[in-house]
Amino acid sequence: MTKKLTAQEKLNRKPIPTACVFCHEKHLQCDLGRPCQNCSKRGIGDTCRDKERKPRKRGPRKVKKEREVSASTKSEISNTINQQLIPVINTATAVSNRQNSSKIIKAKQTGVSTKKTRISKLAMDSLPLQMPVINSPSDMFGKQKKVMSPELPKIPSLTQLFNPTAEPIISDALLPSNQNSAANLPSLADKTPLEEFKNKPLSERAPQQGPQQPAQQLLPIPEKLNSDHTSSNSSTGEFGSVWTTEEYTKLNDMLSTPNLSRNNSKTYLNSNIAWSPSNMMKMDPITESQRPINTQELLNLTSNGLKRTHSRPHISLDQMASESKRHSANDTSPESQGGETVENLSPYRFRLLVKTPEDLYKHQALIQPHNYKSAYLELLRFLRWRFINSDKPSSGKSQRDGPEQLQNIAHSIKTHYAPIFVTLTNSLIAQDLKLQEIILQRALLEYESMAKLVNCTPMCIWRRSGEICFASNEFISLTGFNKKEILNKRKFIMEFMDNESIVDYYDIFHEYLAFGSTQSGPFNSSTGTSDGQAIFSECNLLLKNGCYLRCACIWTVKRDAFNIPMLIMGQFLPIFDIE
């Protein structure tokens, strides 16, 4: 038999508006306390909270009920107004009767009716206006829409916005004062300096001889270009960052700088053609090397010296670098006299500062994008010295082997590497390049730890410019050099190869390894990997005694998120010929 409940138990078991989450799920009787008794007994009082109810759906019955309520409210408001107006009118009538008792009845009735009208108007003005109630969709889209909705401003079309002859949409008071207005712009009838220069005869186009001007005035600055309506490029060049522009400029210098042989008067790199996507495929190593050069062209080359061809005449990166060095030498501010940045450290000194990933992120603020401009400039000087200046022809080779090999390298850069590199780096900004450098250093730490933990073949890691970043102990033992000789200053991997190995390396790297092979060939089938990130080859490795050791090698590339090569890892295994 069911136990009879006491009065207190009946009171406790009364239903409450909202139960807690636990009691709602377990179907228990909850109380008003928080935490409730059920949660307190079970030790879960910290999680005791009210159960949130789902919002009810608004069906057609609910909408119909709201309409009825609105109609009844409307009738109540009208009744209230009538009830409030009746005593006001009666009081006014009594007062007028006492004041006009001596007048005739007709005048009294006329005055009463006039005052009634005035009082009713005052009463209606004192009451708040009633908002229109929308009872049907027809009212919503009918007359009520015109009353409730304010008129929206008209938005001009694109044709009206970009029409120069139309009236201005924005007020002149809102426009900045430093912008060029229509009155400040030159008329179409006025000729720009460029058009006047084109219309002059050839005899008048020669510059007038005058006093010697400083080097800064020889190159026009971007402000002058903008004022002459000839160019609108910013000071950073054609790309979003100055680092990408400098790297592209050095690649362009390697392609467009003339190289003269010592023993003859012929050039093997065409200096009159600067690299551009339009004339990308015009240079051929065979036809260019066999093209005869007349005496006048040779005299012009000799008198002008080995000048670089600037693809952007309005900016000189070399002059900017010299100017920045001069300003930094004269600058005595505490910011410029601070500690050395990570960018200027050699790989050997950088590893003494950053040994773990924690150190890398600790010194993250000091890391700057790598200066590939100076790297390519020094690499260009080394390649000239290796292939031209120090070229000693043997009995089986002609004197033109060195310049022809250098021309093959330039042709490989121009055909396979530079177009894709420019396309991928066109949209990069300074923050992207800084992130690339941080990712490069983080990947380099992983490669170094792998080389230390696992006994591997001799390994060396370098950047896409050829700068060596890491050399394993096995590589040091194989070549005979020590780590300070390789890592304490800028060293290129090309310094440890002979001429033929350098040419083969650039052919493999530019055509198959840098951005992945785009064509099927022997490197994809037999000596390469399926992902296009590793290539097997052979090279001659320089030893400390001056001899070359034949090695089987594999080049592995590490790319970033933009598919740009960051690091190249080379593993070398010596090949000993059996006699």
From Swiss-Prot:
A single GO BP annotation from the record?
Answer: cellular response to starvation
Any one cellular-component term (Gene Ontology): nucleus
The record's InterPro entries line, in alphabetical order, gives: ERT1_acuK_gluconeogen_tf, PAS, PAS-like_dom_sf, PAS_13, Zn2-C6_fun-type_DNA-bd_sf, Zn2Cys6_DnaBD
Which CDD domains does this one have? GAL4
- Name its cellular compartments: Nucleus
* Xref: PROSITE patterns: PAS (PS50112), ZN2_CY6_FUNGAL_1 (PS00463), ZN2_CY6_FUNGAL_2 (PS50048)
| SMART domains (UniProt xref) | GAL4 (SM00066)
Region Disordered, annotated ranges? 43-75, 319-342
DNA bind region? 20-48
- Judging by the UniProt lineage, the source's domain of life is Eukaryota
* Keyword list, A-Z: DNA-binding, Metal-binding, Nucleus, Transcription, Transcription regulation, Zinc
Ranges of biased composition (kind: Polar residues)? 330-339
List compositional bias (Basic residues) regions by residue number.
54-64
Q: Which family does it belong to?
A: Belongs to the ERT1/acuK family.
What does the function comment of this entry state?
Transcription factor which regulates nonfermentable carbon utilization.
PANTHER family, sorted = GLUCOSE STARVATION MODULATOR PROTEIN 1 (PTHR47659:SF8), ZN(II)2CYS6 TRANSCRIPTION FACTOR (EUROFUNG)-RELATED (PTHR47659)
> Know the name of this protein?
Glucose starvation modulator protein 1
Native species of this protein?
Answer: Kluyveromyces lactis (strain ATCC 8585 / CBS 2359 / DSM 70799 / NBRC 1267 / NRRL Y-1140 / WM37) (Yeast)
